[in-house]
A protein has these predicted regions:
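Short amphipathic helix-loop junctions that connect adjacent transmembrane helices
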Residues: 29-43, 220-236
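Interfacial helix-cap and linker-helix signal at transmembrane-aqueous boundaries
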Residues: 34-35, 66-67, 152-157, 226-227, ...
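Helix-to-loop junctions at the C-terminal end of transmembrane segments
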Residues: 57-71, 154, 251-263, 348-349
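Conserved MFS/SLC helix-loop-helix module at the cytosolic interface between two early adjacent transmembrane helices
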Residues: 58-93
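Structural signature of the two symmetry-related core transmembrane helices
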Residues: 73-87, 266-281
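Helix-loop junctions at membrane interfaces in 12-TM secondary transporters
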Residues: 90-101, 284-294
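Intracellular juxtamembrane helix-capping segments at the cytosolic ends
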Residues: 110-125, 304-317
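Symmetry-related core transmembrane helices of the 12-TM Major Facilitator Superfamily/SLC fold
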Residues: 161-178, 357-373
Length: 385
């Protein structure tokens, strides 16, 4: 159980998980309106998201240097920047302006993502308490509330920039909590060495890549699928990312209980299969009800894919190599978090938006039948590092 002392100790990074959930939840619900405003095809919109993804990955690479320079002010500065920069894409009227503006906004959130996860890891290390699943559940709950609220506001006629202005005001209060950061920089870790360690990092990174790709692609395209493919309105479309966020929060809160009874690899394989079934249902649905059910099942399953992979990698490397191993896995995995939406756009352009969710389900089954067994086989050969 999470205690009040745990929350108090982690309040600074937890406020940043709230910030990211609010920003990306609002963005997901605004995708149909933004896409219509800049008047582009699925493929061009996907290309805009890809441009933003490249900037985000670069920002993740630069985040440790920024953290070393700003120290305890890093999270507050990045949270403030992210809240302000998300106003700009809502003002764009064409793809030439939208792509670079979204790049800057996404870059701020990417750097913040790295730092806040490092801070949560530091709190875990100091207190000896697991907090990562709870932190990601906070993100999911904020994402769900924000997506639903933004959809309702869009139904009432609010333009995207007005919605993001409201989120920015809420974010100002959260920045005050981020200023409570008292963490010290993490010590450098030794590099994980040997073929076993490299194989573990590669396999774990691929699992996280697919999991994040499915998660963020659904966040970015579910509202459009519900509205364009199935004829839903703005509020009905916003329920897609909202349902995903809510079920992911439930999945993450309950995931730890499953790990006490089953191995990480077993939970990982079953969760990936469950999320694949949800993706198939959502993609092939002919009505809103089945699509909602599909997104709910997808959210429950995919919510624990990345945490299980992170946990498995961290448990199977030596103490001195753990930080470096998690950093490398993150760089592989988070690329999936950002390439998912543009890949969905390209696939949608080629074969249709519904079938792009079916293709996503196939990728998730690759975890169940290929990557999870390979991780289990490597686990049997002993610890790496």
């Amino acid at each position: 159980m999470i205690s009040r002392d745990d929350i108090r100790a982690a309040r600074a990074p937890l406020s940043c998980f709230l910030t990211l959930g609010l920003l990306w939840g609002a963005f997901a619900a605004q995708v149909p309106g933004i896409k219509a405003r800049i008047a582009v095809s699925d493929g061009v919109f996907g290309l805009c998201l890809l441009v933003a993804a490249m900037g985000t990955i670069l920002a993740m690479w630069l985040a440790p240097r920024l953290d070393a320079r700003l120290g305890q002010r890093t999270m507050a500065a990045l949270a403030l920047a992210a809240g302000g920069l998300f106003l700009l894409p809502g003002l764009a009227t064409g793809p030439i302006g939208f792509a670079p503006l979204l790049l800057f906004a996404a870059a701020a959130t990417g750097a913040l993502d790295v730092v806040m996860n490092a801070r949560i890891s530091g709190v875990e290390a100091r207190r000896g308490r697991p907090l990562m699943n709870f932190a990601h559940a906070v993100f999911s709950m904020a994402y769900a509330v924000s997506a639903l609220t933004a959809g309702l506001l869009r139904e009432l006629g609010w333009p995207p920039v007005a919605v993001f202005a409201l989120i920015a005001l809420v974010n100002l209060a959260l920045v005050r909590l981020a200023l409570a950061d008292r963490a010290q920089p993490l010590d450098d870790a030794a590099d994980p060495r040997g073929a076993a360690a490299r194989g573990l990092i590669l396999l774990g990174g691929l699992v996280i890549l697919i999991g994040f790709m499915a998660e963020n692609a659904t966040e970015g395209w579910s509202a459009l699928h519900l509205e364009r493919s199935l004829g839903g309105g703005a509020t009905e479309g916003a329920l897609g990312p909202a349902i995903l966020g809510a079920t992911m929060a439930l999945g993450r809160l309950g995931g730890q209980a499953l790990v006490t009874r089953y191995s990480e690899i077993t939970v990982l394989a079953l969760a990936a299969a469950l999320s694949a079934m949800g993706a198939f249902a959502a993609g092939l649905a002919e009505g809103l009800a089945l699509a909602y059910a599909g997104f709910a099942v997808l959210g429950l399953g995919v919510s624990v894919v990345a945490p299980m992979a992170f946990s498995h990698v961290g448990r199977n490397v030596g103490n001195r190599a753990r930080t470096a191993a998690i950093a490398r896995v993150s760089m592989i995995g988070y690329s999936g978090f950002f390439i998912g939406p543009p890949v969905m756009g390209f696939v949608s352009e080629a074969i249709g938006l519904g079938w792009s969710f079916v293709a996503m389900g196939g990728a998730l089954l690759f975890i169940t039948f290929i990557l999870a067994p390979l991780l289990a086989a490597q686990d049997r050969r002993g610890h790496a590092g």
